[in-house]
Amino acid sequence: SLTKTXXTIIXAMWAKRLFTSYPQTKTYFPHFDLHPDSAQLRKNIDNIHSALSKLSELHAYILRVDPVNFKLLSHXFLV
């Protein structure tokens, strides 16, 4: 489980990095409420490992997304 500080850092990074660095990615996540006070983000931030694991499996095995595109996402986290 994440600490409150770690959750705050991840939430700030997510909002500032991925959708700011790659605004075109918003088109793939129209159902995400990305506002600063989003109940959806607060509800799921402590379970981010599980959520990303399921997302990884979905992209790799069901949607068959080219792994090259994962570099864009990881870059957004690292920037």
From Swiss-Prot:
Record-listed heme b binding positions: 59
UniProt KW Iron keyword: yes
N-acetylserine modifications at: 1
SUPFAM superfamilies, per the entry: Globin-like (SSF46458)
One MF term in the entry's GO annotations: oxygen binding
Coiled-coil parts of chain: none
GO biological process, one term: hydrogen peroxide catabolic process
Keywords attached to this entry: Acetylation, Heme, Iron, Metal-binding, Oxygen transport, Phosphoprotein, Transport
Segments forming domain Globin: 1-79
Modified residues (Phosphoserine): 38, 53
Any one cellular-component term (Gene Ontology): haptoglobin-hemoglobin complex
A Pfam family annotated for this UniProt entry: Globin
Subunit structure, as described in the record: Heterotetramer of two zeta chains and two epsilon chains.
Membership in a protein family: Belongs to the globin family.
General function of this protein: The zeta chain is an alpha-type chain of mammalian embryonic hemoglobin.
Family annotation (PANTHER family): HEMOGLOBIN FAMILY MEMBER, HEMOGLOBIN SUBUNIT ZETA
Protein name per the record: Hemoglobin subunit zeta
Organism of this sequence: Notamacropus eugenii
